[in-house]
Amino acid sequence: LAGYLAMRYILWRSLQSLIYTGPLDFIGMALLYLAEMYGLILLFLGMFVNLWPLTGRPTILPKDATDLPTVDVFIATYNESDDIIRITAIAATQMEYPQDRLRIHICDDGGTLNKRGQPESMEAAWERHYRLRRMAKELGVNYITRGTNGNAKAGNLNHALNHTDGELVLMLDCDHVPTTNMLQRTVGYFLADPKLFLVQTPHFFINPTPVEKNLVGVGNPNGENDMFYRTIHPALDFWNASYFCGSAAVLRRSHLMEVGGICGKTITEDSETAFLLHSKGYNSVYVEQPMVCGLSPENYDDYALQRTRWAQGML
């Protein structure tokens, strides 16, 4: 229906609405027409890409536990509360995977040496540093921080990459709690395909966004994440073009290090990294089953800031 209406609009716009009334009017009319045609081209391209969603991908389970690769779990944090970090770290320790092949790391960018050395942030940074180190020791996981906060999250993850050596890396935001079977349902794909660099899983959120909260009285509308993770991403998977979405993803270290780790040239380091590795001929897999439980921004300011950052980075 959308395609039919778009074609009808193109015919009307091209054959009946373009009337020359003067040079200045023509310039404005032409610019608007070209902008509309560009938008419609993107619409049809998106519809074409989404024609063949790849669903029902079979799970590849490892046959022999001795063949399982080593896995580093990175829990990236900056200024989130200790309680949120603790829940995710505990869940990571409960994942069903051989313990001698699993290492969990809290990657803290809120307690860096730089923050601990600045008068305005010194006290809070030192307190956070000691608290998270104590928490990590209590839970039996590692605590990693660095000297500065350069390149934000990308720099944090790259620092952790340079201080670990697991064959695979599970990336988690600190408010993304993994299921116990997450590694069991993702690691097997890497054993089946040596050129695979990414297995991405959906982001599932337990709380509504500020926009969804205001949609009272209109039933239970599908959120924007549903459209991306249930419709768009399975279609991208058909074209071997899955995104790295920054969290809830397993990556192969060797391929990642070929491009210098997580790319930090833009503020959407995850998508940039996926584009670069796809351009080198490596493969990706999207597993449609949600295997993390996360938190959406709770207020409109944080929501707008997050979406603005995504939009700027993709541009």
Task: Label every PLM stretch briefly.
Residues K265, A274-V292:
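Catalytic donor-sugar/metal-binding loop of nucleotide-sugar-dependent glycosyltransferases
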Residues L1-D67:
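N-terminal membrane-anchoring/stem segments of glycan-assembly enzymes
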Residues R131-G140, I144-L168, T179-I267, H278-S279, ...:
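Long helical/loop segments within the catalytic core of UDP-sugar-dependent glycosyltransferases
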Residues T88-R101, G111-T112:
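Short, acidic, metal-binding catalytic loop of nucleotide-sugar glycosyltransferases
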